[in-house]
Amino acid sequence: TLFRSTHGHKDHVGGINVFYKKYKPTIYTAGSIIKEANLKVDNYVDINDELELDDIKIIPIPTSHDAVDSRGYVFESGKKSIVYMTDTGYINKKYNQLLTNRTLYIFESNHDIELLMNNPNYPYYLKQRILGDEGHLSNIDSANYLAKFIGPDTKKVFLAHLSEENNNPELAISNLKEILKKKKISFDNIEVATQEGPTELIKI
């Protein structure tokens, strides 16, 4: 069993200690993340570089988040590929080519800016953190990136990491479709990956 982490925040690695105790997977991640998240594991490979396992190539993409060694990933197998990109305030343009025309995207669309700014439950400092370069992609940020990346080989987009208070699935999908339409990009196979359970199993 293989585990590859994106970063060390508790909401992303909080269950690893329990999972590891039962299944003893090999954890492929940076040692700094093991330390930051206080993970009680000894079977890990301290690596944050490109990795090949069987016929799958795993390419880490540095993200901009307030966590040590945060990463998104590109998974390649033959002519098929998946992008997993969440928990980042922006994406460095030097990775645009690597992220373009992939088969499937799992892509952060965290918040609607207006809902976030008008949310009385979020203090000002937290709003600024979310909106900052080390925060999260808004619906509009996400849509503009995806409009650059979606290509003729793209089959599916899952919008992910939606805020329960500052977003909703209909709004995130609508924002993406509007921007794709403005840019004359014909693509509508879009779903939201919810926090309530797994998505359906799909073949790419």
Residue positions per predicted region:
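Short active-site oxyanion
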Residues: 22-26, 81-82, 188-189
